[in-house]
From Swiss-Prot:
Highest taxon in the source lineage: Bacteria
Pfam families in the record: DUF1128 (PF06569)
HAMAP family: UPF0435 (MF_00829)
InterPro entries the UniProt entry points to: UPF0435
Protein name: UPF0435 protein SAOUHSC_02093
Species in which this protein is naturally found: Staphylococcus aureus (strain NCTC 8325 / PS 47)
Family: Belongs to the UPF0435 family.
Length: 68
């Protein structure tokens, strides 16, 4: 069974280890572009560690996908 956008965001949020987890509210990604979110999810999951600049870039990309 495929993951929902919300499940992907939860997994990304956990991997990024973001202190303020409210910044990545899974509910705000229900209608996000599934292909773009999957690309981000796949990248994050493929990495053992993420550099601070990668975390920033991922957070920025997620911010562009979020629906308020």
């Amino acid at each position: 069974m495929a993951m929902t956008n919300e499940e992907k965001v939860l997994a990304i949020r956990e991997k990024l280890n973001i202190v303020n987890q409210g910044l990545l509210d899974p509910e705000k990604y229900k209608n996000a572009n599934e292909e773009e979110l999957t690309d981000i999810y796949d990248f994050v999951q493929s990495r053992e560690r993420l550099s601070p600049s990668e975390v920033t870039a991922i957070a920025d990309a997620l911010g562009q996908l979020r629906h308020e």
